Swiss-Prot record:
<dbReference type="InterPro" id="IPR003798">
    <property type="entry name" value="DNA_recombination_RmuC"/>
</dbReference>
<keyword id="KW-0233">DNA recombination</keyword>
<dbReference type="GO" id="GO:0006310">
    <property type="term" value="P:DNA recombination"/>
</dbReference>
<dbReference type="Pfam" id="PF02646">
    <property type="entry name" value="RmuC"/>
</dbReference>
<comment type="function">
    <text>Involved in DNA recombination.</text>
</comment>
<protein>
    <recommendedName>
        <fullName>DNA recombination protein RmuC homolog</fullName>
    </recommendedName>
</protein>
<comment type="similarity">
    <text>Belongs to the RmuC family.</text>
</comment>
<keyword id="KW-0175">Coiled coil</keyword>
<feature type="coiled-coil region">
    <location>
        <begin position="43"/>
        <end position="167"/>
    </location>
</feature>
């Protein structure tokens, strides 16, 4: 409005200055009308003066005056036309100035709005970009432990898979080894028997070695899963079982190897069936004697972690089967003496059960570890979610402040600016458009 005050003052002064000019023009027009009336009267008088020579000179004088008046009137008329033309030019200049000022104001208002809108969008984009960069940095920092946890979890899974494949390969190799070993045993049995018959100490060492081989073939490690020749003192003297197998719950299994070979070999070499039966009976009695001797050692009293029985390892299926043929109650007799008879087949089953329990213990440990990692991962994801929600609230507040600015600009600035159109100011159909309102809730695309 301040820019229009000089224009209004100029217009008002022009109107004040034009009032005398209009009055003067009106007076000249009145005089001209009177002059025309007098000319008409003079013409009438001239008609009458034709008859009167004396009046001719007066008529001529009036004519001269009329000519002068008409010339003056023509001059006044030309001056009036020039003044009117100048006045119209001034009016046109005023209108052009008014149009230029209106266009300049509209352009200035549009540029101001566009500049303010652009500056706000630029600042908003800068803030959004900064918030996005900070959010990405924070998110990357927060997700780094998650990545590390996932890498550790992936490494654990790969290790478990490799362990499974290794165990499967070990089992396959073990079966192949057992098959080859059985063939080798058949070929070397006679040589071994002859060597063992002549050296009792060698028989004991052979039985202990067979026991160690069976345990190790099942995946148990010496000094970790089992120990050999562990000595304890008792009332009956120094006791030394051949092996102690450790179980994950803290218990132990006591295993002692017993080899009864002489009577069995005599029966195998006997040609007469009666003698063969006698030797087999002697072999069965020797097995029973080993059971009695092992029962009397009371290993369950010396090892508090051991159950109330001891395992008697016989390093050969045929040794036990030959004794059972002569005494069918041998299993029950040994059980009553708290002795469990075990051949390589039975002991393999026991050892594999123990190894499986150890593996289950490892799996349970890994499962607990995975559970802890999962809990840690969940807590960190919850923190990430909280930060994401805080970032969303910040963006929502920025959009709300922008909408408040647009609403204030629309209701307090543009409303006043649009009133110029009500004053019939030429704006050449230029209209100030409304600033857009941003949506607070982002539109999400539907995903099938």
């Amino acid at each position: 409005m301040t820019a229009f005050l000089p224009f209004l003052a100029f217009l008002f002064g022009l109107i004040i200055a034009g009032l005398p000019l209009l009055w003067y023009i009106r007076q000249q027009k009145t005089a001209l009308d009177g002059l025309q009336a007098r000319v008409l009267e003079g013409a009438k008088a001239e008609e009458q003066a034709r008859r009167i020579p004396a009046l001719e000179q007066a008529v001529e004088s009036w004519r001269e005056k009329a000519s002068l008046l008409m010339a003056e009137q023509a001059a006044n008329k030309r001056g009036e036309e020039e003044r009117e033309k100048a006045y119209r030019q001034q009016i046109e200049q005023l209108k052009a100035t008014e149009d230029a000022l209106s266009q300049k104001f509209d352009s200035l208002a549009a540029k101001t709005l566009e500049k303010a809108h652009g500056q706000f969008l630029e600042q908003a984009q800068m803030r959004f970009a900064k918030s996005e960069r900070e959010g990405e940095a924070k998110l990357e920092l927060l997700l780094q432990p998650v990545k590390d946890s996932l890498k550790r979890y992936e490494a654990s899974v790969k290790e478990a898979e490799q362990l499974r494949q290794t165990e499967y390969g070990s089992l396959t190799a073990l079966v192949s080894t057992m098959r080859e070993g059985q063939e080798a045993v058949k070929n070397e049995a006679n040589k071994l028997v002859n060597a063992l018959r002549t050296a009792p100490k060698a028989r004991g060492c052979w039985g202990e070695q067979q026991l160690r081989n069976v345990l190790e073939s099942c995946g148990l490690s010496e000094y970790v899963d089992f120990e050999t020749e562990v000595s304890v003192n008792s009332e009956k003297g120094r006791l030394r079982p051949d092996a102690i197998i450790r179980i994950p719950n803290g218990s132990i299994l006591v295993v002692d190897s017993k080899v009864s070979l002489n009577a069995y070999q005599d029966a195998y070499d006997a040609v007469d069936e009666d003698k063969r039966q006698l030797y087999l009976q002697a072999h069965s009695k020797a097995i029973k004697a080993h059971i009695d001797g092992l029962s009397q050692k009371n290993y369950w009293d010396q090892f508090k972690e051991a159950p109330d029985y001891v395992i008697m390892f016989i390093p050969g299926e045929h040794f036990l089967s030959a004794a059972l043929e002569q005494d069918h109650n041998l299993w029950e007799y040994a059980f009553q003496k708290r002795v469990l008879l075990a051949t390589p087949t039975n002991l393999i089953a026991i050892a594999r059960t123990v190894a499986a329990v150890w593996r289950q213990e490892d799996i349970a440990h890994n499962a607990r570890k995975i559970g802890e990692l999962g809990k840690e991962l969940y807590e960190r994801i919850a923190k990430v979610d909280a930060h994401m929600r805080a970032l969303g609230n910040s963006l929502e507040n920025s959009v709300k402040n922008y909408n408040k600015f647009v609403g204030s600009f629309e209701s307090r600035v543009l409303v006043t600016a649009r009133k110029f159109r009500e004053l019939n100011i030429e704006t050449k159909e230029q209209e100030i458009k409304e600033a857009p309102i941003l949506e607070i809730t982002p539109r999400m695309e539907d995903k099938e």
